[in-house]
Amino acid sequence: PTRRSSDLVSTNKKENTQGGLSSYTHVKEDISIMLRTNADNTIEQHVFTTMFDFYALPSNFPGYNEAKEIENPYECIQHLEHSFSVAIEDKRFIPYFQLHEFEALLFCGIDSLVEKYPKCKKNCEQLTNVLQKFGNPELINSNPSTAPSKRIINAIEGGKKQLYKYNKPATAKAVTANIGIDVLRSKCPHFNEWIEKLIAK
């Protein structure tokens, strides 16, 4: 039988940082090292994937300029992921970009966000309105002032009197864990496709 385990590699290796990508060059170097140092055998079979935000993605990623010209968000991401896969050239590699950033997943369970910040229940109603407008969390746009994380921060910290200081990494982890992967998959088509690819491997 093959052994199952997983390793998570951060895009930012400095202590007390929230991640973020600086350059495709660094990403490719890290992936290339992992591919070379993890060979498949009869005991271990490896799958490599990414979870990068499309929002604020470095422009030197393969296919980036062409993808930006594609109006349909899903077709745009498909082009970007295909270009990334071609550049890496390894059948074990499954690229994934989050539309439009990780915080979009929190829109799958706004009630869970309210549980963490109960005094902002009224403010969080605007998040429900945003979700209804766009149809699903993955379509909430990536404008610097209206990206999912910016909308959430505004709901939690906005108002005449700031009641909370929004903790972005801790909240994202806690809320998505509370929502559960089944709900995330049911409400986010591209996220679900990624999970299905990983399961199929």
Residue ranges and their predicted role:
Residues 2-5:
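Short, small-residue-biased leader/transition segments that mark boundaries at the very start
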Residues 7-15, 31-201:
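C-terminal accessory helical subdomains adjacent to catalytic cores in phosphodiester-
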Residues 10-26:
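N-terminal beta-loop-helix "entrance" segment that forms/cooperates
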